[in-house]
UniProtKB/Swiss-Prot annotation:
This protein's record includes keyword Signal: yes
Tissues showing expression: Ubiquitously expressed (at protein level), including in venom glands. Found more precisely in the epidermis, fat body, gut, muscle, and venom of worker bees.
Identification of the protein by name: Serine protease inhibitor
Site (Reactive bond): K77, S78
TIL domain ranges (all copies): 43-104
Family: Belongs to the serine protease inhibitor-like (TIL domain-containing) family.
Signal peptide from the UniProt entry: 1-28
Location in or out of the cell: Secreted
Keyword vocabulary terms for this entry: Antibiotic, Antimicrobial, Disulfide bond, Fungicide, Hemostasis impairing toxin, Protease inhibitor, Secreted, Serine protease inhibitor, Signal, Toxin
Function (record text): Dual role peptide that functions as a broad-spectrum antimicrobial peptide and antifibrinolytic toxin. Inhibits trypsin (IC(50)=375 nM), plasmin (IC(50)=2140 nM), and microbial serine proteases (subtilisin A (IC(50)=294 nM) and proteinase K (IC(50)=459 nM)). Exhibits antifibrinolytic activity by binding and inhibiting plasmin. Does not inhibit chymotrypsin, elastase or thrombin.
Organism field: Bombus ignitus
Superkingdom to which the source organism belongs: Eukaryota
Principal location: secreted
Annotated S-S bridges: C43-C83, C52-C79, C58-C73, C62-C104, C85-C98
Amino acid sequence: MKMKLLQVHFVLLVSSSFLLGYTGMVTAAILSRPQVVFVEDTCRENEIFSQCQASPNCEKSCDNIDIWESVPCIQTKSCVSGCICEDGYVRDKNQGVCILENSCPRVRH
């Protein structure tokens, strides 16, 4: 297995000679089949890396903070790896970042 050091946020390993990605430093193995590889050091401020998290649709956010604990989430996958908000933080989907729960913009009705 050949190893390469890449400056990417994620690596889409399509073949041994074709890679796609964004910012962040990772070590990627060139594998024989396509797959997406996320690594811990690509997480942003107030995020932590999780090898196995619920579907991203189930992440606590400013949009669902009031009903998050009372309404079950329908997961699209049983387990995915990636960055999640640290405890006490929720995803602000407008900006895509994790902010303190009490910093969520208030919705006016």
